[in-house]
Amino acid sequence: MAAEGARRPVIIAGPCSVESREQTLATYRGLAACGCVDMIRGGVWKPRTYPSCFQGVGEVGLEWLAEAKAETGLPFGVEVANSRHVEAALGAGADMVWIGARTTGNPFSVQEVADALRGTEVLVLVKNAQMPDTGLWTGAVERMLAAGVGPERLVLVHRGFAQTSGNEYRNPPVWHVALEMRRRFPELKMLCDPSHICGRREGLAATAQKAADLSYDGLFMESHV
């Protein structure tokens, strides 16, 4: 994973959830026109707390992402939480998969995904677990490495941590936890997800700047029309 130009941060952007073909294509056309986005992202399966909440459009969303890739020339990535997701994503031509915070917190799910990725060449992003626990995050990384996902294809994503009291952030960054992961895995790139950390537009620029000041390698952001 690399951006063109010396030291330019990597930018991965796209909607939290793809909702329709029209929304997906319009979003990615806009991102491609920016000229600064390296990869497009979009969720098609959503791990919601309640079954009554939107669960994502499912595999049809992969078709829209693949179409956006074909039109814009930008590679695409999708969140996966089990082996079926991995198989469907790779079958649709995904260039990247990411493991979300809820999945990182479940070693059984992480191992299932790791086993499904064995022998593939896809880029793999691992978000921190919901709680500020370096153990769960470390364990997820170690499972990926053990499955043959080399450090050149494995990326950490810092998306903040669940809070139990009022805070200016939706998911407080607790920067020292992420920095400890960088100390443990200096060979891995790390991206910041300011969208999940902030939960709103206010604070995005400051959070992204903080990540840049800490020498993060880029941003993993939500963007949609």
PLM feature spans:
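Catalytic domains of carbohydrate-active enzymes, especially glycoside hydrolases
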Residues: A26-V44, A92
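Glycine-rich anion/phosphate-binding loops
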Residues: C16-G30, E59-E63, R201-A206
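Glycine-rich phosphate-binding active-site loops on the catalytic face of alpha/beta enzymes
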Residues: G42-K46, M96-P107, L214-V225
